[in-house]
Amino acid sequence: MLDIKKIKEILPHRYPFLLVDRVISVEEGKKVTAIKNVTANEEFFNGHFPEYPVMPGVLIVEALAQTSGIAMMQSEANKGKIGLFAGIDGCRFKRQVVPGDQLLLEAEITRMRGAIAKAKVKATVEGDLVCEAEIMFALSDLPQ
């Protein structure tokens, strides 16, 4: 399990764009399961939509990409790197995410060759599928 302090050591994202609150399981270099607690105080609800708050789908995908980043960085070979979003396939949204929901974020690295990685990702709320996709990343060194 990784708390927010450990997550910040792995990911370069910060408020308001750090979208992973806690990691609950890790299979080193392979799979990560994480949580995003969606609260009424999220900055994006000010405009999406004030009278009918719904978490934007692109931010659900970003939370899944960040979860994938944590999974990729668990591999010793990828320490000090960043996974840059390079593509997405088969993305489908099945349910809205609203204040009070807890997103369960799952990312499994399915391919890692050179500087290219792919992850199969899934987000659920209380067992209901919210989003699934396959995301591709280009690994790059972090600037010193």
Curated annotation (Swiss-Prot):
One of its GO terms (cellular component) is cytoplasm. The keyword Cytoplasm applies. It comes from the Bacteria. InterPro entries: FabA_FabZ, FabZ, HotDog_dom_sf. The keyword Endoplasmic reticulum does not apply. GO terms for biological process: fatty acid biosynthetic process; lipid A biosynthetic process. Keywords: Cytoplasm, Lipid A biosynthesis, Lipid biosynthesis, Lipid metabolism, Lyase. It is found in: Cytoplasm. The active site is at 48. Belongs to the thioester dehydratase family. FabZ subfamily. This is 3-hydroxyacyl-[acyl-carrier-protein] dehydratase FabZ. It comes from Listeria innocua serovar 6a (strain ATCC BAA-680 / CLIP 11262). The gene is fabZ.
